[in-house]
Amino acid sequence: MSNLKPLFFFAVAVLALVGCKPKPADITSLQRKEAAILVSEAQFAMSLRDYMRAEGLLAKATALEFDNGNNWVSLGTMRVRLGQRPAAKKAYESALNAFEAACKLEPKVPQLYLQQVYALALLGRVDEARTLLVSVEKKHPGDPAVREFVQGKQLDAMLKSALFKEISL
């Protein structure tokens, strides 16, 4: 029995180390393709202003490809347009979670942080969005997209936009 203790502790240590690293979601390529088709159909429905159909299609797409923050944002937008604010908030929070998870997988990609800023702003958490933006600017000072976003005061412009006000909470 005492011979198994070191093996047990080794196994626990290995499992702990393996569990600490962020992993990509287990989504098959078939699921991603099906979600892309659903999103395409939803975009067509949006162009026809059939928001109810678009919302249903986006809900199916996010169920298949739950790690795609952009799809969650689209779902939240449709739900706001349909007057389903609590459901929209859940979708926007899922978008934020997806963007945060993507940042953990690829911390050197500044665009993912800018998407988090957008999701925070949609949720009405503007102070958090500004704090994150300052942090991103410090982490990625040479990135042209970050520089343009900050120097162009795009967050402020976005917050003043009538369209953004329609879809934000």
Description of each model-found segment:
Residues 25, 130-169:
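Terminal, low-structured helical/coil segments at or just beyond the last alpha-helical repeat
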Residues 31-60, 64:
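Alpha-helical segment of the N-proximal tetratricopeptide repeat
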